[in-house]
Amino acid sequence: ANAKVRLVLCLNKSSGQLVWQKPLDLTELGDTPAAMVNNGVLVLFGVYLDGHYWQQFFAGQFAGRRVTALDGHDGKQLWSQQVGYRVRPLIIGDTLHAEPWAFDLKTGEAQKRAHPVTGEEERWQFARPGHHCGAPSASPHMLFFRSWNLGYYDLDGDYGTMHFGAQRPGCWINFLPVGGLAVMAEASTGCMCDFPNQGTVVFQPVRENKAWAWFSAPGLATPVKDLALNLGALGDRRDASGKLWLAYPRPSGSLVLALEGEAAFYAGGRFSQGESVYAETAGTDAPWLFSSAATGLRKLSLRLVQPGDGTATYRVRLGFSEPVHSAPGQRVFDIVLQGQGKPGASIDPPTLGGGFWYSPTITGSWSDER
């Protein structure tokens, strides 16, 4: 008796003549149903209040939010399912993006990818930590949105949310791709958030990507199959082979991939960052990997398997650099894995030769049931 049945109509855009009509129950589309169409698919969904509702999202209060897709030619239902998205969806080509997930436009099947650590197939998702007013906008290859500041996502590179500081979009959709540029039109007047920056800002593309990203993945990052860590880095990034290097310590935020671990340093030790663009490089095609480091590291503990996963054997490769031109014998590293020293596992970076940056590797294996 309380069903919200509406009549969905398709009209010929030239003549205005009725092509088809279909009664549809829109109860699970909320109080403000909306529609969009692409590639012959009509998508019906609900528009809900904008705001910072992560607590409600994780509590499952949005689980009943439904999306329905109809064939635009005859009104036949292609699919209808509860998606539980956070803000209004958008379409890019044949993909429906319903934050934080993505779906095949014509089938509703969830888009998936391999987890960069476990190798298991997981749902594609992205993170929008911090203040995240408004809904995303998009171009064929990018998502644009607020995440603390200006946030954007390279859908082709697919390595996480990137940020541009000191600017922020307004409270709705004003960060827009236009003619090869990214335009943030003024939309802050009357907003009471910090740094309203009342003005229009236009960004043009650059040839060299120097941005760090925050990758998102569901669940535990165990058991580990392949883990590439970039110690001290400001974010995540893929190398030329496509391997995703994860920053450690991990950036924090809702839906950002988390790792269970702990680092301990000798006196004066710390994670540090530099700028690879201005550093001499040798022996690597990814100098950004050596623009950060764990200096004076005494111990790094990482959770590779969970209790009950059984025994696992791993091979470990470590990268070293010599950025301070120290003399041989001044900075000798002894490598201990699982409490056991490894034969020949002493590294003296100044003796390795090459250039300003070095990237030798040390290998070893051990078992871990903890």
Describe the predicted segments one by one.
Residues A1, L7-L26, R66-Q82, T107-H132, ...:
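Aromatic (tryptophan-biased) beta-strands that constitute blades/sheets of beta-rich domains
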Residues A1-V8, K22-T68, S80-A102, Q125-L150, ...:
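Repeat-blade elements of multi-bladed beta-propeller folds
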Residues L26-T27, Y85-R86, T118-G119, A345, ...:
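A short acidic/small-residue loop/turn micro-motif
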Residues D31, W54-Q56, D194-N197, G329:
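Short, solvent-exposed loop/turn and secondary-structure capping segments
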Residues L49, L96-H97, F103, Q111, ...:
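Short, isolated positions in well-ordered beta-strands
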Residues K112, E122-C171, L176-V178, G308-R317, ...:
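Ordered, small/hydrophobic-rich secondary-structure cores
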Residues M162-K210, G353-G354, Y358-R370:
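Extended, hydrophobic interaction surfaces within ordered domains
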Residues K210-R370:
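Compositionally biased, intrinsically disordered or flexible polar/acidic segments
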